[in-house]
Amino acid sequence: MFTNIFFNILAAVVFLFIFWKKLKEDYIPNQIFSAAFSAILGVLLANILIFNFFPSWWFWASLIGFCAGLTISIYRFKLRFFEVLDSSVIAALPWLLIIFLVNSVAFASTSSLVASVFILLLISIYLFSDAHYRKFTWYKSGRIGFSGLTVVGLFFLTRSLVALAFDNVLSFVGKTEIYFSTTLAIVSFFAIYSLSKKEI
Protein backbone atom coordinates (compact mmCIF):
# COMPACT_ATOMS: atom_id res chain seq x y z
CA MET A 1 0.00 0.00 0.00
CA PHE A 2 2.72 2.47 1.00
CA THR A 3 4.64 1.56 -2.13
CA ASN A 4 1.63 2.41 -4.29
CA ILE A 5 1.15 5.71 -2.46
CA PHE A 6 4.81 6.63 -2.90
CA PHE A 7 4.89 5.88 -6.62
CA ASN A 8 1.57 7.63 -7.23
CA ILE A 9 2.89 10.74 -5.49
CA LEU A 10 6.02 10.51 -7.64
CA ALA A 11 3.87 10.13 -10.76
CA ALA A 12 1.75 13.12 -9.74
CA VAL A 13 4.86 15.29 -9.37
CA VAL A 14 6.06 14.22 -12.83
CA PHE A 15 2.59 14.95 -14.23
CA LEU A 16 2.55 18.43 -12.69
CA PHE A 17 6.01 19.28 -14.03
CA ILE A 18 5.34 18.16 -17.60
CA PHE A 19 1.90 19.79 -17.66
CA TRP A 20 3.37 23.08 -16.45
CA LYS A 21 6.31 22.89 -18.87
CA LYS A 22 4.02 22.40 -21.87
CA LEU A 23 1.69 25.29 -21.01
CA LYS A 24 3.95 27.82 -19.28
CA GLU A 25 4.42 29.93 -22.43
CA ASP A 26 0.69 30.59 -22.83
CA TYR A 27 -0.77 30.63 -19.32
CA ILE A 28 0.14 31.85 -15.86
CA PRO A 29 1.22 29.28 -13.22
CA ASN A 30 -1.99 29.72 -11.22
CA GLN A 31 -4.11 28.63 -14.18
CA ILE A 32 -1.83 25.73 -15.08
CA PHE A 33 -1.54 24.25 -11.60
CA SER A 34 -5.21 24.84 -10.80
CA ALA A 35 -6.13 22.84 -13.90
CA ALA A 36 -3.62 20.10 -13.04
CA PHE A 37 -4.76 19.79 -9.43
CA SER A 38 -8.40 19.76 -10.56
CA ALA A 39 -7.60 16.79 -12.81
CA ILE A 40 -5.78 14.97 -10.01
CA LEU A 41 -8.61 15.71 -7.57
CA GLY A 42 -11.08 14.36 -10.12
CA VAL A 43 -9.10 11.12 -10.32
CA LEU A 44 -8.97 10.77 -6.53
CA LEU A 45 -12.68 11.45 -6.02
CA ALA A 46 -13.69 9.10 -8.82
CA ASN A 47 -11.60 6.27 -7.37
CA ILE A 48 -12.90 6.85 -3.85
CA LEU A 49 -16.48 6.67 -5.12
CA ILE A 50 -15.95 3.54 -7.18
CA PHE A 51 -13.51 1.64 -4.95
CA ASN A 52 -16.09 -0.16 -2.82
CA PHE A 53 -18.47 -0.97 -5.66
CA PHE A 54 -16.63 -1.55 -8.94
CA PRO A 55 -12.88 -1.59 -8.21
CA SER A 56 -12.05 -3.12 -11.60
CA TRP A 57 -13.34 0.06 -13.24
CA TRP A 58 -10.56 2.17 -11.71
CA PHE A 59 -9.11 3.14 -15.10
CA TRP A 60 -12.38 4.41 -16.54
CA ALA A 61 -13.31 6.11 -13.27
CA SER A 62 -9.91 7.81 -13.27
CA LEU A 63 -10.35 8.89 -16.88
CA ILE A 64 -13.78 10.38 -16.23
CA GLY A 65 -12.58 12.18 -13.09
CA PHE A 66 -9.48 13.42 -14.92
CA CYS A 67 -11.49 14.77 -17.86
CA ALA A 68 -14.10 16.32 -15.57
CA GLY A 69 -11.43 18.21 -13.63
CA LEU A 70 -9.80 19.50 -16.80
CA THR A 71 -13.13 20.44 -18.37
CA ILE A 72 -14.07 22.56 -15.37
CA SER A 73 -10.71 24.34 -15.58
CA ILE A 74 -11.01 24.89 -19.33
CA TYR A 75 -14.28 26.73 -18.84
CA ARG A 76 -13.17 28.49 -15.67
CA PHE A 77 -9.93 29.90 -17.09
CA LYS A 78 -10.95 29.95 -20.77
CA LEU A 79 -8.11 27.61 -21.73
CA ARG A 80 -7.76 26.34 -25.29
CA PHE A 81 -9.05 22.78 -25.42
CA PHE A 82 -6.50 21.20 -27.75
CA GLU A 83 -3.56 22.82 -25.97
CA VAL A 84 -4.75 21.31 -22.70
CA LEU A 85 -5.44 17.97 -24.40
CA ASP A 86 -1.94 17.79 -25.86
CA SER A 87 -0.31 18.75 -22.58
CA SER A 88 -2.39 16.43 -20.43
CA VAL A 89 -1.73 13.42 -22.67
CA ILE A 90 2.06 13.65 -22.55
CA ALA A 91 1.91 14.49 -18.83
CA ALA A 92 -0.34 11.53 -18.02
CA LEU A 93 1.61 8.90 -19.97
CA PRO A 94 4.48 8.70 -17.43
CA TRP A 95 1.87 8.20 -14.69
CA LEU A 96 0.45 5.21 -16.55
CA LEU A 97 3.97 3.96 -17.19
CA ILE A 98 4.77 4.02 -13.47
CA ILE A 99 1.51 2.21 -12.62
CA PHE A 100 2.24 -0.61 -15.06
CA LEU A 101 5.91 -0.87 -14.07
CA VAL A 102 5.07 -1.11 -10.37
CA ASN A 103 2.43 -3.74 -11.09
CA SER A 104 4.81 -5.74 -13.29
CA VAL A 105 7.39 -5.86 -10.49
CA ALA A 106 4.99 -6.37 -7.58
CA PHE A 107 3.03 -9.20 -9.22
CA ALA A 108 5.54 -10.46 -11.80
CA SER A 109 2.97 -9.51 -14.42
CA THR A 110 4.10 -10.01 -17.99
CA SER A 111 1.06 -8.18 -19.37
CA SER A 112 1.87 -5.10 -17.27
CA LEU A 113 5.47 -5.21 -18.49
CA VAL A 114 4.26 -5.34 -22.10
CA ALA A 115 1.91 -2.44 -21.34
CA SER A 116 4.88 -0.47 -19.97
CA VAL A 117 6.78 -0.99 -23.22
CA PHE A 118 3.69 0.10 -25.14
CA ILE A 119 3.42 3.30 -23.08
CA LEU A 120 7.09 4.03 -23.81
CA LEU A 121 6.31 3.59 -27.51
CA LEU A 122 3.40 6.03 -27.23
CA ILE A 123 5.65 8.58 -25.53
CA SER A 124 8.11 8.23 -28.41
CA ILE A 125 5.32 8.63 -30.97
CA TYR A 126 4.08 11.73 -29.19
CA LEU A 127 7.53 13.33 -29.08
CA PHE A 128 8.16 12.56 -32.76
CA SER A 129 4.78 13.80 -33.97
CA ASP A 130 4.94 16.89 -31.76
CA ALA A 131 8.22 17.84 -33.42
CA HIS A 132 7.14 17.13 -37.01
CA TYR A 133 3.34 17.27 -37.41
CA ARG A 134 3.40 20.75 -38.96
CA LYS A 135 5.46 19.29 -41.81
CA PHE A 136 2.92 16.61 -42.69
CA THR A 137 1.52 17.59 -46.10
CA TRP A 138 -1.90 16.08 -45.44
CA TYR A 139 -2.24 17.92 -42.11
CA LYS A 140 -2.65 21.29 -43.80
CA SER A 141 -4.01 23.26 -40.87
CA GLY A 142 -0.99 22.67 -38.63
CA ARG A 143 -3.27 23.06 -35.62
CA ILE A 144 -2.15 21.87 -32.20
CA GLY A 145 -3.86 18.73 -30.97
CA PHE A 146 -2.50 16.29 -33.54
CA SER A 147 0.03 14.64 -31.22
CA GLY A 148 -2.32 14.20 -28.29
CA LEU A 149 -5.18 12.90 -30.42
CA THR A 150 -2.88 10.50 -32.28
CA VAL A 151 -1.64 8.99 -29.03
CA VAL A 152 -5.16 8.79 -27.57
CA GLY A 153 -6.43 7.13 -30.75
CA LEU A 154 -3.60 4.58 -30.84
CA PHE A 155 -3.92 3.92 -27.10
CA PHE A 156 -7.62 3.09 -27.23
CA LEU A 157 -7.40 1.28 -30.57
CA THR A 158 -4.77 -1.01 -29.07
CA ARG A 159 -6.84 -1.53 -25.91
CA SER A 160 -9.84 -2.56 -28.02
CA LEU A 161 -7.76 -5.02 -30.08
CA VAL A 162 -6.14 -6.55 -26.99
CA ALA A 163 -9.55 -6.82 -25.32
CA LEU A 164 -10.71 -8.99 -28.22
CA ALA A 165 -8.21 -11.64 -27.15
CA PHE A 166 -7.63 -11.00 -23.46
CA ASP A 167 -9.83 -9.66 -20.67
CA ASN A 168 -7.54 -10.13 -17.68
CA VAL A 169 -5.22 -7.20 -18.34
CA LEU A 170 -4.75 -4.59 -15.61
CA SER A 171 -7.33 -1.77 -16.08
CA PHE A 172 -9.51 -3.81 -18.48
CA VAL A 173 -13.20 -4.45 -17.71
CA GLY A 174 -13.90 -7.54 -19.77
CA LYS A 175 -15.50 -7.45 -23.21
CA THR A 176 -17.17 -4.13 -22.40
CA GLU A 177 -13.71 -2.68 -22.87
CA ILE A 178 -13.98 -3.24 -26.62
CA TYR A 179 -16.94 -0.91 -27.06
CA PHE A 180 -15.63 1.92 -24.89
CA SER A 181 -12.11 1.85 -26.29
CA THR A 182 -13.22 1.51 -29.92
CA THR A 183 -15.55 4.47 -29.56
CA LEU A 184 -12.83 6.71 -28.13
CA ALA A 185 -10.37 5.61 -30.82
CA ILE A 186 -12.84 6.48 -33.59
CA VAL A 187 -13.65 9.85 -32.00
CA SER A 188 -9.94 10.67 -31.71
CA PHE A 189 -9.10 9.82 -35.32
CA PHE A 190 -12.16 11.68 -36.58
CA ALA A 191 -11.07 14.72 -34.55
CA ILE A 192 -7.65 14.58 -36.25
CA TYR A 193 -9.35 14.50 -39.65
CA SER A 194 -11.54 17.47 -38.70
CA LEU A 195 -8.58 19.46 -37.39
CA SER A 196 -6.59 18.81 -40.56
CA LYS A 197 -9.25 20.59 -42.61
CA LYS A 198 -9.47 23.72 -40.46
CA GLU A 199 -7.50 26.87 -41.06
CA ILE A 200 -5.31 28.21 -38.25
Regions found by a protein language model. Name each.
Residues 5-25:
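N-terminal signal-anchor/start-transfer transmembrane helix
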Residues 35-47, 89-105, 143-159:
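Small-residue-rich segments of transmembrane alpha-helices in multi-pass membrane proteins
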Residues 108-200:
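C-terminal membrane-adjacent module
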Residues 1-12, 49-67, 110-121, 179-183:
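Structural signature of hydrophobic alpha-helical transmembrane segments
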Residues 21-22, 48-53, 99-107, 158-169:
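Juxtamembrane "helix-exit" motif on the non-cytosolic side of transmembrane helices
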Residues 65-140:
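Membrane-proximal helix-loop-helix units in multi-pass membrane proteins
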Residues 39-82:
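A glycine-rich, hydrophobic loop/mini-helix early in the fold
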Residues 23-29, 33-36:
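Hydrophobic/aromatic interaction determinants used to assemble and anchor large protein complexes
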